């Protein structure tokens, strides 16, 4: 059941980014990015990384909401463009949703969802060792995981925030 929840969240995640990439208006783009950020953190938390999901969501809300508030105030339109007001925007959105639907059908046809990454050094995460078995708690090792194994998450998050700022500036420049 948890795999299906993660799969549905990833579908909503991709569709929300398709909605943002069709960029009808900065107001709706900011809203869709906030929703996709929340869904992305839900994906991280559904795989057991509650501390990392919370950290990413706090970083995202702290950084991007300020940027979107400023750019939305600077690019206020009397009649903001929606996804169905332009044929090009609507066709881009429909094409992205159809590609996501084809991916979903392909995944259901094969009947398997594989995890992309594997932890090779699980011994580093063990908190209580009882001979042949070890128990680890995700909350206790969350901070150490963020700064040791999760360094790439911090780098990708920082780079994504930087690219997001550039995209928002590009979207609002033409308005």
Curated annotation (Swiss-Prot):
Membrane topology label: Multi-pass membrane protein
GO cellular component: mitochondrial inner membrane
MF (Gene Ontology): NADH dehydrogenase (ubiquinone) activity
Catalytic activity field: a ubiquinone + NADH + 5 H(+)(in) = a ubiquinol + NAD(+) + 4 H(+)(out)
EC number: 7.1.1.2
Protein name: NADH-ubiquinone oxidoreductase chain 6
Protein's gene: MT-ND6
Short name of one Pfam family: Oxidored_q3
Organism: Rhinoceros unicornis (Greater Indian rhinoceros)
Record function comment: Core subunit of the mitochondrial membrane respiratory chain NADH dehydrogenase (Complex I) which catalyzes electron transfer from NADH through the respiratory chain, using ubiquinone as an electron acceptor. Essential for the catalytic activity and assembly of complex I.
Similarity comment text for this entry: Belongs to the complex I subunit 6 family.
């Amino acid at each position: 059941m948890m795999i299906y929840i993660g799969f549905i969240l990833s579908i909503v995640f991709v569709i929300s980014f398709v909605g943002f990439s069709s960029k009808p208006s900065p107001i709706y783009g900011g809203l869709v990015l906030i929703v996709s950020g929340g869904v992305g953190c839900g994906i991280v938390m559904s795989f057991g990384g509650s501390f990392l999901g919370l950290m990413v969501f706090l970083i995202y809300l702290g950084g991007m909401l300020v940027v979107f508030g400023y750019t939305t105030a600077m690019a206020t339109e009397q009649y903001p463009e929606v996804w169905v007001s332009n044929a090009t925007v609507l066709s881009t959105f429909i094409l992205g949703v159809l590609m996501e639907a084809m991916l979903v059908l392909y995944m259901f046809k094969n009947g398997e969802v594989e995890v992309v990454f594997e932890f090779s050094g699980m011994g580093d995460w063990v908190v209580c060792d009882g001979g042949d078995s070890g128990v680890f708690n995700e909350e206790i090792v969350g901070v150490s995981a963020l700064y040791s194994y999760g360094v790439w998450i911090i780098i990708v998050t920082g780079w994504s925030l930087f690219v997001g700022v550039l995209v928002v500036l590009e979207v609002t420049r033409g308005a």
